[in-house]
């Protein structure tokens, strides 16, 4: 997270409290990054609002500028601004959709998680992060190089946030149910699966100092266990990742992040591998 030099903050002019800006200011002060405030709107001029918010951030000692623009949709507008302004993180307040609307249309926040060429922090509430818990969600059953790098990125970002807020780091990984038909004896017994995941977690628990009572390895689907544990420990932030798939439509996020977004009470930081981010950025530049 220390490498982020500019943060794009999506400003919702219809909201009285700008909680995304509150989070961005906390992070910017800690990592000494700049802020760029963005209003996605073309029907009304919000220059005075942006000027006021920019001046407030500047008064707090944060380098800040702003813009208002619109390109066919909110996600497209944000993504273009990320590339134009050279931002390494997007912070946006989550806008929940009704079940009916989600059944008919892809929620705008889901689109942003899928296609944004930078990590995205979705802010779910205005609660203070200070001295809170941070949950890093990884898949200890995936051992390829891309997942390994992504896992380390997830846990290192979570550890950075813990340092920033004097918080407690938790680690979660869901494992599958035993399968008697599995060719690998490890996956035929529940105990051996759990032991395998426990062994794999050692790399992260040792490196980042995760206490054993803060390690959560259990059987079940990730999109069920992650919200359950996050809500149980009262997590301030949940950090998750996705390995994208390249194709004509661009890189697609795994739906775990989308599903848990609405189930979590905590803020959600979604990370992608560097090659996926580069692919998305190249699509925007075409």
Predicted regions: what they are:
Residues 93-111, 240-263:
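Glycine-rich, Arg-bearing micro-motifs that act as flexible, cationic patches
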Residues 1-18, 88-89, 94, 104, ...:
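Intrinsically disordered or low-complexity boundary/linker segments at protein termini
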Residues 1-49, 133-184, 207-210, 268, ...:
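Small/aliphatic-rich secondary-structure junction motif
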Residues 36-38, 65-69, 121, 170-172, ...:
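General small-molecule cofactor/ligand-binding pocket signal
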Residues 1-2, 45, 55, 59-100, ...:
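Structural beta-alpha unit
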């Amino acid at each position: 997270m220390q490498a982020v030099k500019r943060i794009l903050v999506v400003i919702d002019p219809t909201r009285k409290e700008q909680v995304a800006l509150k989070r961005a200011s906390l992070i910017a002060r800690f990592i000494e990054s700049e802020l760029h405030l963005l209003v996605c709107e073309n029907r009304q001029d919000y220059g005075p609002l942006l000027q006021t918010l920019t001046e407030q951030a500047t008064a707090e000692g944060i380098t800040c500028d702003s813009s208002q623009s619109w390109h066919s949709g909110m996600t497209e507008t944000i993504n273009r601004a990320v590339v134009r302004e050279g931002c390494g993180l997007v912070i946006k307040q989550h806008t929940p959709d009704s079940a009916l609307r989600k059944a008919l249309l892809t929620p705008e926040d889901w689109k942003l998680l899928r296609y944004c060429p930078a990590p995205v922090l979705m802010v779910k509430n205005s609660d203070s992060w200070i001295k809170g818990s941070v949950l890093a969600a990884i898949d200890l059953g995936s051992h390829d190089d891309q997942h390994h790098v992504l896992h380390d990125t997830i846990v290192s970002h979570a550890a950075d946030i813990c340092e920033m807020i004097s918080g407690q780091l938790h680690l979660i990984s869901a494992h599958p149910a035993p399968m008697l038909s599995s060719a690998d004896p490890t996956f035929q017994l529940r105990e051996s699966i759990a032991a395998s995941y426990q062994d794999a977690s050692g790399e992260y628990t040792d490196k980042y100092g995760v206490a054993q009572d803060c390690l959560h390895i259990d059987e079940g689907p990730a999109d069920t266990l992650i919200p359950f544990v996050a809500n149980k420990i009262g997590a301030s932030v949940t950090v998750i990742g996705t390995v994208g798939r390249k194709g004509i439509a661009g890189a697609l996020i795994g739906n775990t992040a989308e599903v848990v977004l609405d189930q979590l009470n905590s803020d959600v930081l979604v990370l992608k591998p560097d090659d996926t981010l580069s692919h998305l950025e190249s699509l925007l530049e075409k």
